[in-house]
Every structure is written in structure tokens, then in C-alpha cells.
A protein has these predicted regions:
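Histidine/acidic residue-rich metal-binding segments in metalloenzymes
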Residues: 95-198
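N-terminal metal-binding scaffold of metallo-dependent hydrolase/deaminase domains
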Residues: 1-3
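Conserved short loop/turn motifs at secondary-structure junctions
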Residues: 57-62, 89, 193-196
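Metal-associated gating/positioning segment near the N- to mid-region
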Residues: 11-78
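Hydrophobic faces of well-ordered beta-strands that scaffold small-molecule active sites
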Residues: 19-25, 53-55, 83-87, 107-111, ...
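A generic structural signal for alpha->beta connector loops
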Residues: 5, 50, 80-82, 105, ...
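A glycine-rich helix N-cap at a beta->alpha junction
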Residues: 74-89
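Conserved beta-strand scaffold positions in the cores of enzyme catalytic domains, especially
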Residues: 6-10
Length: 198
């Protein structure tokens, strides 16, 4: 850098990052670009001090095969920050997950153990086991117990956001996370539990 700064900070012994890393962004491209896309989302990230993002696969269509992943890599050329993309796990694509280890631009595998936006739910234990057995990258998990969610759905009050953490409470997350940790250990694979309930 050629510019002189007005102020100097002593960072000896500290870890210094040029910006923060957001490991879970939903820029919704392709599919729902009326709300945001890779270009606008990455601009907003940079303006907020985020210099690297990992984008989620629950788009339309979802990023669950090499064709859609390649399209997303191409779309990523319009982004303004460092980026990588998650490859979505399904009950059907588990054999593909073995082939991701050296896939350029892939930061990991996203598993939705509880229902969320999109149709990537993998909630049956044998399907979750197949995902972990064949995973060649870290598996990032939306960790909620779908059966408990179904039982608690009656607690939702339409229009009342305060019922969201009542419906999707700590036990919903803990039950699923216990199962995920057990499966990950059995297959000696890495799991990253996302947005935990506190």
C-alpha cells in the first residue's frame, strides 16, 4: 500500500482480519432475485465490513448437482467479495457428495435436518447417515428435529413473530444436534451446527 495512514495500531500478537467472514448468507440467486442477488448481496456485505461469504444452496433451483453448482460459480463472477458456495444434500444425491473434496468454490455440504425455505429437507436418520458416510467436506447443518417441529406447529400464532422461538425451541435444536453429533462421530466426519437456538 502506498497511502500513509493517519493512525497506526499495534497488532503484535493479535489475529488481524481485513473484514469479517459470514459463513451463512442467503442471496437467493437463482430464483428469488426480487429480494436480493449475488451482486447486490455481496455489495451489502462489503459495505457492512464482511469481506468473505459462504452462500447457501436453497435457491430455485437448488444447488444440489454439478450443473447447478457450475451455474452458481458463473453467477459468482458478479460478486464484490470473496465467496464460496455450499452444495445442498438431498436424500438422493449422497453418492455425489463423495466427489466434492476438490471442487473449486465449494465450502461444504449443507444439510437441512429441519424444514426451512426450499425443499432440501433430509430428516430421516438413514438418509442423514448416508450424507455423512459419503461426505467429502464439512457438513453444515440446519439442526432442528422435524418430528418435534411438526408436533409443535400448533404453537404458531399467525402474524406473531414472538411465537417463532416458542415453536422452534431449544429442545427442537438439541434433539437434532445430539443425533447429528452421534452420526458425525460414527462416520468420523466434521459437522458444523448453524444458527443454534440459545
Amino acid at each position: 500500500l502506498k497511502d500513509e495512514s493517519k493512525e497506526t495500531f499495534d497488532a503484535k500478537g493479535l489475529t488481524v482480519l481485513p473484514g469479517c467472514i459470514d459463513t451463512q448468507v442467503h442471496f437467493r440467486e437463482p430464483g428469488s432475485t426480487d429480494t436480493e442477488d449475488l451482486n447486490s448481496g455481496s455489495k451489502a456485505a462489503v459495505m457492512g465490513g464482511i469481506t468473505s461469504v459462504f452462500e447457501m444452496p436453497n435457491t430455485k433451483p437448488p444447488t444440489t448437482n454439478f450443473e447447478e453448482f457450475d451455474k452458481k460459480i458463473k453467477l459468482g463472477e458478479r460478486m464484490f467479495c470473496n465467496h464460496a458456495f455450499f452444495f445442498g444434500a438431498t436424500a438422493e444425491n449422497y453418492l455425489t457428495l463423495e466427489k466434492l473434496k476438490d471442487l473449486k468454490g465449494c465450502c461444504g455440504i449443507k444439510l437441512f435436518a429441519g424444514s426451512s425455505t426450499g425443499n432440501l429437507l433430509v430428516d430421516k436418520e438413514n438418509d442423514i447417515e448416508k450424507v455423512f458416510e459419503h461426505a467429502s467436506k464439512v457438513v453444515a447443518v440446519h439442526s432442528e428435529d422435524e418430528e418435534i417441529l411438526k408436533m409443535r406447529k400448533k404453537l404458531i400464532e399467525k402474524g406473531n413473530v414472538k411465537t417463532h422461538p416458542v415453536w422452534r425451541n431449544e429442545e427442537v435444536a438439541m434433539s437434532s444436534t445430539r443425533r447429528i453429533v452421534k452420526i458425525a462421530k460414527r462416520f468420523n466426519k466434521k459437522a458444523h451446527i448453524l444458527h443454534i437456538t440459545t
